[in-house]
């Protein structure tokens, strides 16, 4: 028996067979081996198996994909083997009891020159739970469960455990999906999350939607208490680290004013010969979080900390993230240091990593360092001021080196949510990245590169932060879209892929666009065509940073990837442990962990964005009828999104625009009947017509 025989049997059986029938045809020969082969073929997307224990051959009559539902009751499904192709339309009658996010087997049907998909079977029920609100029915007689996920708008919900789970109006609850029949969902209520009238509870419910843990397990908290030993009590460990001590250095932290999980600290020294030493000291989380402990297991499940508008959902319990591991000022801390030397031009000429003990002498924040850079206002000791001056000097040199080599850089604003003490949104404002944030970023990037290069040269298993080059066609599309703004770099496709030429194009955008918001939107449009950075075992480099080798070393309090990096640095460099079995285990673990943390990172980013969106809707909910100036951020088939000065964004639906509008996919513009058009960057005046808190949706209309 081999894979080819299995595939031949499935193919001869009309490309579908039950696992039992397959085993029978193979005379039940070596069932564990059959299981392994099927698993491998499934992972390679050659075969797929379903909840009904059937096996399908993919690429012929049957395809596999994830179903995405529209609130109106129909859906779309993509083909995993052709992810770039347009998704297939699935009418309500062809859903076969499946719903949003389900992994399904489907077949394509051509009906009167129209192509649609029919769901054949369910492979995997991705969504197990629904979050929603208990609301009173229109006639006031009943309490209904309304899911927050708009993909389930068209479903009726029946609660199976109403008697043992009394419900009240305005409750936000979590429900487990039990079964589905046509457009009827049967659920069991699992827990009450909070009150829909409280902003803080609404935010917490979004974290629950994304299945991000909001509480730690008891075993994890118990382990956190066990390892909570002040540095001063670990005399032997202190003595061991004293040979590489940073206690006499002017080490400082620079973070957000509200930050509590302080991972990183810096010290810069300018030498007499004009060269520089940069010390990047990172909290030694691996000293406290050992592999396979409850702390470690839950940290891997979480993957990273998630930063919401009014709270942090940390990767580690706060006793570690905000206290024991955090590089709080005037307290001895264990750290891993990356010491780098730079020449007079800002080029790194040496690097080393070691365990150390340190004290952060000053706790600085970005605002005050930005103020110092702008106006030379300083409220701390003179020694720290001198160090910051040298840090700024080195930062400027490194920045120029990175730009020359092709690091893609541009400034973008982010929406910042301002809340009162009750977590009610009182303001949304645009936050610009300052010079101090860029300084820390450049120093952290340098340390990440240095660490990655050290281990890469040792040819040992390691976790890398890879960023693949963009797809050539995607990048051509981006360059093409710039022509409607009068920007045409006249590059060959090969030249377009060169990061240096991308930087030159970004510079031209800056020079030719008079409006900074238009420039920002054009810069952001590039990101849509970029590959997503991810964690992997094999190094392929980082395109965006124009780096041959990159990892994440600088944030082990809030990223599990960095915790892995610290452990392997200690194993390889400090303990010089190259045991072959241990290396094989490292390789296997990196592969497993990378899959998990790539997913948790995406989930956290999506959750953070959804919270910001929910907060902007809440902020605009009492501004219905108000008129504002805005900028078109993107034109799509169904309308235009308009961004206000404070980065609040709303949709002008195509039904509220002029009739007979045509969408130009190439230039991303909506063409009106008089040949004028709507495109990104245009200034418009809008009126707010709705802000639906439950749907998290803002609607505008244009005002003449």
Residue ranges and their predicted role:
Residues 1-279, 286-332, 370, 669-679, ...:
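Charge-lined substrate channels and their catalytic hotspots, especially those that engage the 3′ end
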Residues 24, 169, 174, 180, ...:
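Electropositive polyanion-binding surfaces
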